[in-house]
Amino acid sequence: MPHIDIKCFPRELDEQQKAALAADITDVIIRHLNSKDSSISIALQQIQPESWQAIWDAEIAPQMEALIKKPGYSMNA
């Protein structure tokens, strides 16, 4: 708490880049939510482009009103 779940198209990130990403995100969460470092968890899931529709349908579209940053694209047919 909080838990951040990042889903993105595949990227070539080495362990150092992943650690830097996690550190930057952690800093933002600490600053804005007044969380402790030890309470933050972050997942990075790389999703193939052809599978993104399932993410949209299950996680993005149903939560559109709750998103604090909405996507600048739509996958509605």
From Swiss-Prot:
Principal subcellular localisation of the protein: cytoplasm
Alphabetized SUPFAM superfamilies for the sequence: Tautomerase/MIF (SSF55331)
E.C. number: 5.3.2.-
GO CC field: cytoplasm
Entry's localization field: Cytoplasm
Activity regulation text: Inhibited by (E)-2-fluoro-p-hydroxycinnamate.
Gene3D superfamilies: Macrophage Migration Inhibitory Factor
Active-site annotation: P2
Highest taxon above the source species: Bacteria
MF terms in GO: intramolecular oxidoreductase activity, interconverting keto- and enol-groups; protein homodimerization activity
UniProt entry keywords in alphabetical sequence: Cytoplasm, Isomerase
UniProt keyword annotation of Cytoplasm present: yes
Keyword Cytoplasm tagged: yes
UniProt-listed Pfam families: Tautomerase
NCBIfam families: PRK01271.1
Purpose: Can use enol isomers of phenylpyruvate, 2-hydroxy-2,4-pentadienoate and (p-hydroxyphenyl)pyruvate as substrates.
Assembly information from the UniProt record: Homodimer.
Family from the record: Belongs to the 4-oxalocrotonate tautomerase family. PptA subfamily.
Protein name per UniProt: Tautomerase PptA
Species assigned in the record: Escherichia coli (strain K12)
